[in-house]
Design a protein with these regions (language model features):
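P-loop NTPase nucleotide-binding/switch module
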Residues: 170-209, 213, 240-295
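The Walker A (P-loop) glycine that initiates the GxxxxGKT/S ATP-binding motif of P-loop NTPases
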Residues: 221, 285, 307
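Walker A/P-loop
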Residues: 219-260, 325
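Peripheral, non-AAA+ core regions of ATP-driven protein-machinery
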Residues: 1-218, 222-228, 331, 471-472, ...
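Basic, amphipathic alpha-helical bundle interface domains used for macromolecular binding and assembly
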Residues: 33-44, 59, 66-76, 290, ...
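Short loop/turn elements that form and flank the Walker-type P-loop nucleotide-binding site
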Residues: 26, 58-61, 98-99, 131, ...
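Walker B catalytic acidic pair
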Residues: 300, 306-307, 318
Length: 517
């Protein structure tokens, strides 16, 4: 007897419907075809144990299993459930009439319990596109899958519940989530706020400019000056995620298996802060079965690299291409996968190996050569992709002792959103450009060209401060954002002057002059 059930294979962000065909005829052999990996081939043992534990026997006949399309590699244990159901139906132990109406995924434990799988959300999207009546998933995956409208999603605890449901012996209600309500309720629930930060007004301003224009930023300052504290509060002033951005971001986390059983849509921009010992594969993605790395988990959010020079130089260099292209391709011998990685890069670092170069309250023991060597751990091409370079001074006692709260994140966020709306209107007809940080050279000349007085000041600053040539475009991009925050149609002298102040590391004499001179 021939029976079909349906599942899905996830490769990168792409999902393909998999048809599982089971044929049982007299005999004793078990045959598997369909390019499955080791976990798929081992499913026979898991299924046999799960069935026996629940009163069924694995078919003792000539059994042929095929997973189509045969040229598509199938990976993981998510095919256990649909294969087990097809085996039972083909062996005439259950009525399999309804199998064709549902897509199924789930790993079977030896006792028949359903274990969570990766990629339930993109699988649900595929099931809806293929016009299945519903999707059956492990209970732990039901909330993330249920965000897909116009699809019945059933979360099951074990294989016996699935059998009862498919055969019509027991009624189950599909999981229902008010996606929009949950999304908007959680959108502004931030635990951290800039009102908690004492002093550091110049750094807050730099972070506001970075948020308004989508600019990458690096903070340089001694230990304890508040670099990490400031960075962790940046999501609270960023424009909120749109539903489309949230769905895309949640899919990536679903594929990576990073969603909890209580998760539905991710409602706030991701903030990822990998340790400096992270490997290249963990940062950009990879592995035997390529999975998203930290840069993709930070998609539509922030990637924060604390103590940047402590990262492996080779690991840092692999960031250059994703920062430019906003997508990462991971290639293997017979296939490749692609993950989006449109993130805002925020970094922090000490000014020298001992950490106290230029600190008025501590003595630095580093030589200029040691400082320069420390700074050279960050390559020019990587630094070229960071628009704002902000120095942080230790907070004076008079600021620490203040009892009045600082400006709240909500107030700053209003200004950021207003500036972003100006940019969205400006670039509405340009594909792939949404904020000032993404402007091309041609667009810089079109939208950020300074007036005559500003050009002269910029020329003078580049000569006097030994600014590098690559700083020119970055200054104009940042100046355009500052003008947007001011509601100014033209880039004017004050905007250029402030933007010049954000290019500290481009100064040729950085290691020789004092940091705060």
């Amino acid at each position: 007897m021939l029976v079909k059930s349906y599942s899905a294979a996830v490769n990168g962000m792409e999902v393909t419907t998999v048809t599982i065909e089971v044929s049982i005829v007299p005999g004793v052999m078990y045959h598997f075809t369909g390019l499955g990996d080791e976990a798929v081939k081992e499913s026979r043992n898991r299924i046999a144990a799960a069935l026996q534990c629940n009163g069924y026997l694995f078919p003792r006949k000539d059994t042929t299993v095929n997973m189509a399309p045969a040229d598509l590699r199938k990976e993981g244990s998510s095919f256990d459930l649909p294969l087990a159901m097809a085996l039972l139906a083909a062996d005439e132990k259950i009525d399999g009439t309804n199998l064709a109406s549902y897509m199924m995924v789930g790993e079977l434990g030896l006792d028949g319990r359903l274990q969570p799988v990766k990629g339930a959300l993109p699988i649900a999207i595929r099931a809806r596109a293929e016009h299945f009546k519903g999707l059956i998933v492990p209970k732990a995956n039901e909330r993330e899958a249920a965000v897909v409208n116009n699809l019945e999603v059933y979360g099951m605890e074990n294989i016996m519940q699935v059998i009862s449901f498919i055969t019509g012996q027991q009624h189950f209600s599909p999981m229902v989530i008010d996606t929009r309500k949950e999304f908007y309720e959680q959108q502004y629930n931030f635990d951290l706020d800039y009102a908690d930060v004492k002093g550091q007004e110049n750094v807050k301003r730099a972070l506001e400019v970075a948020a308004a224009g989508g600019h990458n930023l690096i903070m340089i300052g001694p230990p304890g000056s508040g670099k990490s504290m400031m960075a962790k509060r940046l999501p609270s002033i960023l424009p909120p995620l749109s539903l489309a951005e949230s769905l895309e971001t949640t899919q990536i986390h679903s594929v990576a298996g990073k969603l909890s059983k209580n998760s539905s849509l991710i409602s706030q921009r991701p903030f990822r802060s990998p340790h400096h010992t992270i490997s290249e594969a963990a940062l950009v993605g990879g592995g035997i079965n390529p999975m998203p790395g930290e840069i993709s988990l930070a998609h539509n959010g922030i990637l924060f690299a604390d103590e940047l020079p402590e990262f492996s130089k080779h690991t840092l260099e692999v960031l250059r291409q994703p920062l430019e292209d906003r997508v990462i391709t991971i290639s293997r011998a017979k296939y490749s996968v692609e993950y989006p990685c449109n993130f805002q890069f925020i970094a922090s670092m000490n000014p020298c190996p001992c950490g106290y170069y230029g600190d008025p309250t501590h003595r630095c023991v580093c030589t200029p050569g040691q400082i320069q060597k420390y700074m050279n751990k960050i390559s020019g091409p990587l630094l070229d992709r960071i628009d704002i370079q902000c120095e942080i001074t230790p907070v004076p006692f008079k600021d620490i002792s203040q009892t009045a709260p600082g400006e709240p994140s909500a107030t700053i966020r209003e200004r950021v959103i207003a500036a972003r709306q100006i940019q969205e209107q400006r670039y509405k007809d340009i594909k792939g450009i949404h904020c000032n940080a993404q402007m091309t050279e041609r667009m810089i000349h079109q939208y950020a060209e300074p007036d005559a007085d500003s050009v002269e000041v910029l020329r003078s600053a580049m000569e006097r401060l030994s600014l590098s040539a690559r700083a020119y475009s970055r200054i104009l991009k940042v100046a355009r954002t500052i003008a947007d925050l001011d509601g100014s149609e033209k880039v004017q002298l004050p905007h250029i002057a402030e933007a010049i102040g954000y290019r500290q590391l481009d100064r040729g004499d950085w290691a020789e002059r004092g940091m705060y001179s």
